Design a protein with these regions (language model features):
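The feature captures the beta-strand-to-loop junction immediately N-terminal to the Walker
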Residues: 44-46
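Helix-to-loop junction immediately C-terminal to a conserved catalytic motif
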Residues: 59
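Conserved ABC transporter NBD signature motif
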Residues: 67-78, 86
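Conserved ABC ATPase "signature" region
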Residues: 126-144
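Conserved ABC ATPase signature
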Residues: 149-153, 157
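Conserved catalytic motifs of ABC-family nucleotide-binding domains
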Residues: 170
Length: 184
């Protein structure tokens, strides 16, 4: 189970008042939610409403000003063990997939990043070629894409590769930040 409890996040405003100091813009105010195992949840909102910020809090990339994120009873921000618990159970597909895929890696290496996580967690070696082929086919791409580079794929195809990488480590939770916006 994943929980957010009374999450507050603010950022320094671009507009600064020289007399009274810096102002802060509240992005998330007292947000609480519980996502039970096996649940698929979509968060909808206008541009700039805090959806991506909430995603960054959920995946441990942004510590909130106050409040708590809890995964399976372990506070994400309270300890290194909490962050490790999160890293072992969560995978993310970013909105800007072009910067999340190393342009010098072949597709098999990009997906291999997720397979490395799975191998470490399970303590066993995988047949990487077979797993990469399976994952590419799972997201609707041919297995021979494994030898290509990101610049050789369309935006939608590269987005699918990023989804395959997220699935590769067999996470308990996959967080998508507008991850299907570029699929063809």
């Amino acid at each position: 189970m994943l929980e957010l409890k009374n999450i507050n996040v603010s950022f320094r405003s671009e507009r600064q008042d020289k007399i009274f100091g810096h102002t802060r813009q509240q992005v998330l105010f007292d947000v609480s939610l519980t996502v039970k195992d096996g649940t698929c949840l979509g968060i909808l909102g206008e541009s700039g409403s805090g959806k991506s910020t909430m995603g960054r809090v959920l995946c441990g990339l942004l510590k909130p000003d106050s409040g708590e994120a809890v995964l399976d009873g372990v506070s994400v921000y309270a300890s290194r063990a909490g962050r490790r618990n999160l890293q072992n159970k969560l995978s993310i597909v970013f909105q800007d997939y072009t910067t999340s895929a190393n342009p010098r890696f072949r597709i098999q290496d990009i997906i291999g990043e997720g397979l490395t996580v799975q191998e470490r967690r399970e303590g066993k070696k995988l047949d990487r070629k077979a797993e990469t082929s399976r994952l590419l086919e799972l997201v609707g791409l041919p297995a021979d894409f494994a030898d290509r580079f990101p610049h050789e794929l369309s935006g939608g195809q590269l987005q699918r590769v990023c989804i395959a990488r997220a699935v590769a480590c067999k996470p308990k939770i996959i967080l998508f930040d507008e991850a299907i916006s570029s699929l063809d």
